[in-house]
């Protein structure tokens, strides 16, 4: 589907949006009211005031946070049609240096807490099988639920390689059916207890926070917040489906969700004081309000919807990581584009890492009740960080008053949710906070490690090829040096002033000189056009020192050896470089010689070579080098696995250094003798 149609909105775009964006927030009714009942204890404690107040809290939480903050405000803060906390940070980062920590905390928390989303939603749906008499085994054998969830999640993560559009088209109709069904069931139950409609009044929401029937007090907000954890996905997935499609579909989704929450509340009002229900604990009104004849069909539909809920998290994670790589918060990864829309991506490393962590959580907690107790803590941090960045964006647009109002209003509200969610820490929230800290440290080390490295050698980091042309020409013609390669290729990122990293020329000239007939310095630019494939050449006034700028579309193969061979053939044909005849080869005559690609790596132990470096800088720079060495090599990014590649270890600092503490002892002795 074309990006332009996604941005303008269409029926197909809205269907894809239902399948991609709303899975998380759309399946919250599976577990939110269950969590609120667990907070109350036995069902008899869920008095009418408690039930109406709880549903009112859900209604106004969805209204204020999801509708007002995200749909009405955040979706307007798009960065070239992309959303998410990192895209927002890129818009406002020039306003203050400290904002980078806001973005890093928010992004890390979103990635960490998202690992619980697939686990809790799919487990909640599958647990519905426990209530079926014909499937008593799910109650008798506790391992059957996590095993079933594992099989479902592995299948989901496996199909991600097909792309967002394919997955969205498949899931969209199912989510449309899901929302219609849960809204309809909710409406049927509302008719049995119309008093639940009083939940539309915010008075009941405020009263329940301080009511003696609410044993949790303000900490009830920790369970209420589960209703809106998927709100951040609306913003993160904007680049996948377009703002117009989210604007068009959210009113429908919101209405269906509220009808279902009201229906669950109505069922609780009707049954909470009944003899058969008074002392029941850990009951899920979502399934109980469904007629027994439709229970099996609803469990199947809920399981499908729970699978789709995981989709919103997965696509959002891809976008978040892609933006983090672009901002140099994370190492470069292999990113695939299954469609012609650039923002629709697939990152295999993230996909399977997310799968591994999610499955670990499933087997660690095993029940949805345990997962709900841990779910939502880290995401409150993300929402609070998004609010801070949004206030900066509103102020940047010239609305200082509204900026302060947004920061004060939503900042206070989300701080309350954060405080209320702190009780989750001992119940498993420590896991997501631990993941948040780990991801945050990785991003800090990668970003600031590079900044500190550049600080130490920035003055001499870039040197001009023009100043070394004569040496390269002379080396190329020096028969006293063995021929290293016919074509020696460096992936160099040459700037407009013909400057490259000092380490590249150090590799050619300062180490054992690498004689080649032609030296190639390749700069690769990824363009917004999916199948772009063009190049420009600068011979630098020579016949054997060549700059090449290769422009490749984001869907175009990046196997640069194929393109380079065609470029060499073209330059030989127009007599820009000499033919590279060879007497050996399967095909003859052969005019293009061999290629040698050089990939440079650095080692942590090289940090000892700079005695003036601070210890904290050693940690940051060393950490970055370590991360760089365990991530995929450029040889893999550019399809050079089967080419002749030299992976070369180079010094971190190629400029010669001296230790100011070094003393010439002979000179001191002579001076002492003279005295």
Swiss-Prot record:
Q: Subcellular localization, per the record? A: Cell membrane
Q: Which UniProt keywords apply?
A: Cell membrane, Ion transport, Membrane, Potassium, Potassium transport, Symport, Transmembrane, Transmembrane helix, Transport
Where mainly found? membrane
Q: Name one GO cellular component term.
A: plasma membrane
Annotated catalysed reactions: K(+)(in) + H(+)(in) = K(+)(out) + H(+)(out)
Indicate whether Ion transport appears among the record's keywords.
Answer: yes
Transmembrane parts of this sequence: 12-32, 55-75, 98-118, 143-163, 170-190, 216-236, 249-269, 296-316, 345-365, 374-394, 401-421, 428-448
User: One MF term from GO for this chain?
Assistant: symporter activity
Question: How does this protein sit in the membrane?
Answer: Multi-pass membrane protein
Q: Which InterPro entries match?
A: K+_transporter, K_trans_C, K_trans_N, Kup
This protein's record includes keyword Cell membrane: yes
* Assigned protein family: Belongs to the HAK/KUP transporter (TC 2.A.72) family.
PANTHER family, sorted: K+ POTASSIUM TRANSPORTER, OSMOTIC STRESS POTASSIUM TRANSPORTER
Primary role = Transport of potassium into the cell. Likely operates as a K(+):H(+) symporter.
Which protein are we looking at? Probable potassium transport system protein Kup
- Please tell me the species this chain comes from: Levilactobacillus brevis (strain ATCC 367 / BCRC 12310 / CIP 105137 / JCM 1170 / LMG 11437 / NCIMB 947 / NCTC 947) (Lactobacillus brevis)
């Amino acid at each position: 589907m074309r990006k332009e149609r996604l941005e303008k909105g269409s029926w197909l775009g809205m269907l894809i949006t239902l399948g991609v964006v709303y899975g998380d927030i759309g399946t919250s009714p599976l577990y939110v009211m269950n969590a609120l009942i667990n907070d109350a204890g036995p069902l008899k404690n869920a008095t009418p005031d408690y039930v109406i107040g709880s549903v009112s809290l859900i209604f106004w939480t969805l209204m204020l946070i999801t509708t007002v903050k995200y749909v009405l405000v955040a979706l307007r803060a798009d960065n070239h049609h992309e959303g998410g906390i990192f895209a927002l940070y890129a818009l406002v980062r020039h306003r203050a240096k400290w904002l980078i920590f806001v973005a890093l905390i928010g992004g890390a928390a979103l990635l960490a807490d998202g690992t619980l989303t697939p686990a809790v939603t799919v487990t909640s749906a599958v647990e519905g099988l426990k209530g079926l008499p014909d499937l008593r085994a799910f109650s008798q054998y506790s391992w059957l639920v996590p095993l079933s969830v594992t099989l479902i999640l592995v299948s989901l993560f496996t199909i991600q390689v097909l792309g967002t559009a394919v997955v969205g088209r498949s899931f969209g109709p199912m989510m449309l059916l899901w929302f219609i069904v849960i809204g309809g069931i909710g409406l049927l139950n509302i008719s049995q207890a119309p008093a639940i409609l009083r939940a539309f009044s915010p008075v009941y929401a405020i009263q329940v926070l301080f009511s003696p029937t609410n044993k949790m007090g303000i900490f009830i907000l920790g369970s209420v917040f589960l209703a809106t954890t998927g709100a951040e996905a609306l913003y993160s997935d904007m680049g996948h489906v377009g703002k117009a499609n989210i604007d068009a579909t959210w009113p429908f989704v919101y209405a269906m969700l509220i009808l279902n929450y009201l229906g669950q509340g109505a069922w609780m009002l009707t049954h909470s004081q009944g003899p058969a229900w008074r002392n029941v604990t850990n009951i899920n009104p979502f399934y109980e309000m469904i007629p027994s004849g439709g229970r099996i069909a609803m469990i199947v539909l809920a399981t499908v919807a729970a699978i789709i809920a995981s989709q919103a998290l997965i696509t959002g994670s891809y976008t978040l990581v892609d933006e983090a790589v672009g901002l140099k918060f994370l190492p470069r990864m292999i990113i695939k584009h299954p469609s012609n829309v650039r923002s629709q991506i697939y990152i295999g490393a993230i996909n399977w890492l997310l799968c591994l962590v999610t499955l670990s959580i499933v087997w660690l907690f095993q029940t949805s009740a345990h997962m709900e107790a841990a779910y939502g803590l880290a995401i409150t941090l993300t929402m609070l960080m998004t609010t801070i960045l949004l206030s900066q964006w509103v102020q940047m647009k010239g609305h200082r008053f509204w900026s302060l109002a947004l920061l004060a209003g939503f900042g206070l509200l989300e701080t309350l949710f954060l405080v209320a969610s702190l009780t989750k820490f001992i119940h498993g929230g420590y896991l997501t906070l631990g993941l948040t800290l780990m991801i945050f440290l990785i991003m800090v080390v990668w970003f600031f490690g590079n900044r500190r490295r550049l600080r130490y050698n920035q003055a001499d980091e870039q040197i001009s090829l023009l100043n070394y042309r004569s040496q390269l020409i002379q080396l190329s013609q020096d028969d006293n040096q063995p021929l290293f390669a016919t074509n020696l290729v460096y992936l160099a990122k040459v700037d407009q002033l013909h400057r490259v990293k000092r380490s590249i020329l150090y590799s050619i000239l300062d180490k054992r000189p690498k004689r080649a007939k032609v030296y190639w310095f390749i700069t690769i630019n990824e363009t917004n056009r999916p199948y772009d494939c063009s190049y420009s050449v600068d011979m630098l006034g020579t016949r054997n020192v060549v700059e090449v700028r290769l422009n490749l579309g984001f869907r175009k193969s990046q196997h640069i050896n194929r393109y380079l061979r065609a470029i060499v053939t073209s330059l030989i044909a127009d007599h820009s470089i000499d033919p590279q005849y060879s007497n050996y080869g399967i095909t003859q005559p052969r005019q293009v010689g061999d290629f040698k690609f050089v990939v440079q790596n650095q080692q942590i132990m090289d940090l000892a070579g700079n005695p003036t470096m601070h210890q904290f800088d050693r940690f940051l720079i060393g950490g970055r080098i370590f991360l760089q060495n365990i991530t995929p090599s450029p040889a893999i990014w550019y399809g050079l696995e089967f080419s002749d590649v030299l992976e070369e270890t180079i010094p971190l600092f190629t400029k010669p250094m001296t230790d100011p503490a070094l003393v010439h002892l002979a000179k001191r002795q002579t001076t002492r003798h003279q005295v």
